[in-house]
Structure formats: C-alpha cells, structure tokens
Amino acid sequence: MFQIMLGCDLEERKYILEGTKNAKLAAWWDRAIDIIPKEGGKGTAIEQVLAHYKFSKEESIAFGDGENDMDMLLSVGKGIAMGNAAEKVKEIAADICESVTDDGIYYYLKSQKLINE
C-alpha cells in the first residue's frame, strides 16, 4: 500500500499512528491527512527523481500549499509557497507566489523568465 487518505480533526491525529513504527502523517488540510510510509513522501520522491536524472538540488524548483508539501519544498533548490498556502508552509518557503486560483505558478515562472509567452 502506498498511502491512505483520512479525514479527521486535529485532536484525533495524535491517536492515528498509535502502535505503528513504519508510517507517518502528511497533513494537506486541517481536516485531512495522508498516512504514508515513514521513509516516503514528496521530498523523498523529489530526491530520487533528481538523483535518477542527475540534476542537482539547486537546479530544481517546487510549488506547494499544504503541510504535506513541506518536505518537498525543502528538498529542492527553491521551494515556493502558493499565496493560499498554510502559514507553516509560507514560513519555510524561499519565496511566495500568487494563489492557485490566481495562476500563481504561471505568473511566478513568467516573472523569473523560466517560461516565455
């Protein structure tokens, strides 16, 4: 099994992993979490893709808005929080772009001259 998605409140989270040792929580909303392998997650996946294609961390960029994106944002050269991101995500991000609904990724990439019109 790769992951389980679960709806719960903040108080219930502390009971979910009782008795487990090989899983961790990745919260992506205040009432929703993923249960994933302890050694897994978006950050681990990014690191493996970078290694496979022989890219350095500095050559990579990622965008995220949920707590489940935090390890991914820290695993790249430049982690960008979306404008609608949770405060915890914004605090660890290298930069913040506009929100998802305002096409934040497009306008950020355009402003950095990473894409053309």
Give a label for each model feature.
Residues 59-61, 78, 92:
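Residues within well-formed alpha-helices
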Residues 75, 83-117:
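Asp-based, Mg2+/Mn2+-dependent phosphohydrolase catalytic module
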